[in-house]
């Protein structure tokens, strides 16, 4: 029956997903033990018990189909690999998880779909094994990395004691403070380090996403500049810079303004003429 499923049951592009971390990536010994214990989790009695409880509460109506269970098994490997025992948080975006777990698909138009991963996460959340919360940030115009944490029910299902989890957390506190001492910084308590770890993920993502947004704006502008003459681009740059000066976003003397005009015109000419505005096209030499 398994052979038939693997041969014919192909309602998805990758019916047998496998977690494959990026080349050179490593993880903690504690996370490696979690990954070992999570192998084949959906075929165990513990998983069936959690599904039965979800059915009794009206959250689910049946055991998930075989393709969903395979997705959950692959996703659990990725979750355990990227788990941070100090912050009790999976330090990885859903998109990266979906790609590494073989649960992402890309259309002919280049749009990425991670529906299989999000559905598997939602299912684990309904079982009470993880917490899964999304949050939209209007400042950067997209969702920030999802907060995924492990619950005590998951550790119990994986036969991992609370003492082992606490020991892994203390070990990370010691390691973090050693790194701070090397940098000449004061040591911090566990609560402060946990708060710092949560802030770091969001702040790094916001700065990275802001940079990506800036690149995207430049690429879109380069597409429009492709058919424009140099003098047209000069006029547009001067108009833009005049507006920024009036709004107080650019403050400098006359010579600095001239240099900025030359810099922006040169940048826009290179991007538009060499077709560097495309993420897929190879830059011209």
Swiss-Prot record:
Q: Which domain of life is it from?
A: Bacteria
Q: Which parts of the chain span the membrane according to its record?
A: none
Could you tell me which InterPro entries the record lists for this protein? Answer: Plasmid_rep_init_RepA_IncFII (IPR017837), Plasmid_replication_init_RepA (IPR003446)
Query: Which keywords are on file for this protein?
Result: DNA replication, Plasmid, Plasmid copy control
Q: Which GO terms describe its biological process?
A: DNA replication; plasmid maintenance
The similarity annotation says: Belongs to the IncFII RepA family.
| Protein name per its UniProtKB record | Replication initiation protein
Gene of this entry = repA
């Amino acid at each position: 029956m398994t052979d038939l499923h693997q041969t014919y049951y192909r309602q998805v592009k990758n019916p047998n997903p496998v977690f494959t971390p990026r080349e050179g990536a490593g993880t903690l010994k504690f996370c490696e033990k979690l990954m070992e214990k999570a192998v084949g989790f959906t075929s165990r009695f513990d998983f069936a018990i959690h599904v039965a409880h979800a059915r009794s509460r009206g959250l689910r109506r049946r055991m998930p189909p075989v393709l969903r269970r395979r997705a959950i098994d692959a996703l659990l490997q990725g979750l355990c690999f990227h788990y941070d025992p100090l912050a009790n948080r999976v330090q990885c975006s859903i998109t990266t998880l979906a790609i590494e777990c073989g649960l992402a698909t890309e259309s002919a138009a280049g749009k990425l779909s991670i529906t299989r991963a999000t559905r598997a996460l939602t299912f684990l959340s309904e079982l009470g094994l993880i917490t899964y919360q999304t949050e939209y940030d209007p400042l950067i115009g997209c969702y920030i990395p999802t907060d995924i944490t492990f619950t005590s029910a998951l550790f119990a299902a994986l036969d991992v004691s609370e003492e082992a989890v606490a020991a892994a957390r203390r070990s990370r506190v010691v390691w973090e403070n050693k790194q701070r001492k090397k940098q000449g910084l004061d040591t911090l308590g566990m609560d402060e380090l946990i708060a710092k770890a949560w802030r770091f993920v969001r702040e790094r993502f916001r700065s990275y996403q802001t940079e990506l947004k800036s690149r995207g704006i430049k690429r879109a502008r380069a597409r429009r500049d492709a058919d424009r003459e140099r003098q047209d681009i000069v006029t547009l740059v001067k108009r833009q810079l005049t507006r920024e000066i009036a709004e107080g976003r650019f403050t400098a003397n006359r010579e600095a303004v001239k240099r900025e005009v030359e810099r922006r015109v040169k940048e826009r000419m290179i991007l538009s003429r060499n077709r560097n505005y495309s993420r897929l096209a190879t830059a011209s030499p």
